[in-house]
Curated annotation (Swiss-Prot):
The lineage of its organism: Bacteria, Bacillati, Cyanobacteriota, Cyanophyceae, Synechococcales. Belongs to the acetylglutamate kinase family. ArgB subfamily. Keywords: Amino-acid biosynthesis, Arginine biosynthesis, ATP-binding, Cytoplasm, Kinase, Nucleotide-binding, Transferase. Its EC number is 2.7.2.8. It comes from Synechococcus sp. (strain CC9311). One of its GO terms (biological process) is L-arginine biosynthetic process. It catalyses: N-acetyl-L-glutamate + ATP = N-acetyl-L-glutamyl 5-phosphate + ADP. Catalyzes the ATP-dependent phosphorylation of N-acetyl-L-glutamate. One of its GO terms (cellular component) is cytoplasm. Pathway: Amino-acid biosynthesis; L-arginine biosynthesis; N(2)-acetyl-L-ornithine from L-glutamate: step 2/4. This is Acetylglutamate kinase. Substrate binds at residues 63-64, 85, 178. InterPro entries: AceGlu_kinase-like_sf, AcgluKinase_fam, ArgB, Asp/Glu/Uridylate_kinase, Glu/AcGlu_kinase, NAGK-C. Signal peptide: none annotated. Its main location: cytoplasm.
Length: 285
């Protein structure tokens, strides 16, 4: 990169750095960006940079591929119903071991290596997230968010720490549940009055035509996002992600972004450039 291009990049980023200093940005980390070493390192660098310029990032993660690997290694078969893993007690033990004890610490260590001050938590810690059964309760220990206690995170954020949160939480009886990480991220963003919710995915964002990669919708209003679901333009796996964004925006989050985590440094490109790279849904209209 020549000197003039470096200056151009920094000049474009500066207004956004100034705008978001001291603001909270909740990042749901998952998909290819969690699996491939180059992408993983780029995400860690992006989050560390956000923290270094005064933004307050909060990371929420799942860990589907790692869970699948360990279930196979332990010869535990998975049953899927309505697209969700039916989670019995044996499976839940593995989910909790992998998400809380392994994946969470890998993320924390990766961020700390780059100079961030990351702290690993699960939804159970300090009753940060209280779980309830998902849907009709026929999926075992698959959970939903009953309530969020953001007070757990406030002292950490005030002191410059980066909370890294696994999507495992307990119900009032102390029984652990596996909750969709998108859902946890959205509810935390609302409870923290975050400026942005960013979902790192394995798609470009919301497409006007699912068969046309050039039909990316770069910006939507809340009402338009709802209409796209109603019209079937948003369907399949994009539906729960869009609904997660809608719920967060309806509770006061300023903007939600669905971003292609397969692109190196997607996080910085979305936050600190004029064009961005994904779909931004605005909480107005």
């Amino acid at each position: 990169m020549d000197d003039s291009l470096r200056v151009s990049v920094l000049s474009e980023a500066l207004p956004y750095i100034q705008r978001f200093a001291g603001r909270r940005i909740v990042v749901k980390y998952g998909g290819a960006a969690m699996v491939h070493a180059e992408l993983r390192d780029a995400v860690f660098r992006d989050i560390a940079l956000l923290a270094s310029v005064g933004v307050q990032p909060v990371v929420v993660h799942g860990g589907g591929p790692e869970i699948n690997t360990w279930l196979k290694r332990l010869d535990i078969r998975s049953e899927f119903r309505d697209g969700l893993r039916v989670t019995d007690a044996e499976t839940m033990d593995v989910v909790e071991m992998v998400l809380v004890g392994r994946v969470n610490k890998q993320i924390v260590n990766g961020l700390n290596r780059l100079g961030a001050s990351a702290v690993g938590l699960s939804g159970s810690d300090g009753r940060l997230v209280e779980a309830r059964p998902w849907g009709d309760g026929n999926h075992g220990l698959v959970g939903d968010v009953a309530r969020v206690n953001p007070d757990v995170l406030e002292p950490l954020l005030a002191r410059g720490y980066v909370p890294v949160i696994s999507s495992v939480a307990a119900n009032p009886e102390g029984e652990s549940h596996n909750i969709n990480a998108d859902t946890v991220a959205g509810e935390l963003a609302a409870a923290l009055e975050a400026e942005k919710l960013i979902l790192l995915t394995d798609t470009q964002g919301i497409l006007r035509d699912r068969d046309n990669p050039n039909s990316l919708i770069r910006q939507l209003r809340l009402s338009e996002a709802r209409q796209l679901i109603h019209d079937g333009v948003v369907a399949g796996g994009m539906t729960p992600k869009t609904e997660c964004c809608i719920r967060a925006l309806a509770q006061g989050v300023a903007a939600a972004h669905i971003v292609d985590g397969r692109v190196p440094h997607a996080l910085l490109l979305e936050v600190f450039t004029d064009a961005g790279i994904g779909t931004m849904v605005l909480g107005c209209g």
